[in-house]
Amino acid sequence: IHAEQAAGFDLNAACSGFLFALQTAQAYIQAGIYRTVLVIGVDSMSHMVDWSDRSTCILFGDGAGAVVLRESKEGLFVQAAHSDGAKGDVLTGCSRHRKNWDHPDEAKAAYIQMDGQSVFKFAVRRVPEIVEELLEKARIQKEEISYFFLHQANRRIIEAAAKRTGVDISRFPMNLQEY
């Protein structure tokens, strides 16, 4: 892209990485450091899954997307970033464990492992809370939002979160069935 006056760095945070990168880009723009930022999100997870474990292999794959953010006086960008370290054992693998191919049990521990029920409950509880937080920060009402774009991991999570948020599911676009 011949960007001679540019900086580049890797921000690695799995599913949340693209959102953290957007927040970082917005902060650079808001601080006046850059006027235009290219954010590229890439996940390469297929080598980290146990293909015999249907609870994870259907959820974690490879993909990429990009967006260009520019300085603008129009529009709205509010953000919220949360984590819960107490839930660290709910989704583990790869960086936490080394693969030891000589010992199959140890090699299996290196793959992504997830307590799907806990992830489901957490997401369904937290998404409506975060939607309310963002609406409050933006000083707008749910009715003013055309679409709510959620992480495309699980249709049931999105449907349950929409119901708990009190917003019709038609305003939560989904494309997971295509992948």
Residue ranges and their predicted role:
Residues E129-S146:
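Phosphate/pyrophosphate-binding loops at sites that engage ATP/ADP/AMP, CoA/4′-phosphopantetheine
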Residues I1-H2, L38-M45, R98-D105, I157-I169:
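Acidic-glycine-rich active-site phosphate/pyrophosphate-binding loop
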Residues D53-K121, R125, E129:
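Condensing-enzyme catalytic core mediating Claisen C-C bond formation in acyl metabolism
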Residues A13-S16, G41-S46, H82, E178-Y179:
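Acidic, glycine-rich active-site loops and adjacent beta-strand->loop/helix elements
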Residues Y28-A64:
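Flexible, glycine-rich active-site loops centered on histidine and acidic residues
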Residues I1-T36, K163-Y179:
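Conserved catalytic cysteine-centered active-site region
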Residues I145-R164, Y179:
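Glycine-rich phosphate-binding loops at beta-strand->alpha-helix junctions
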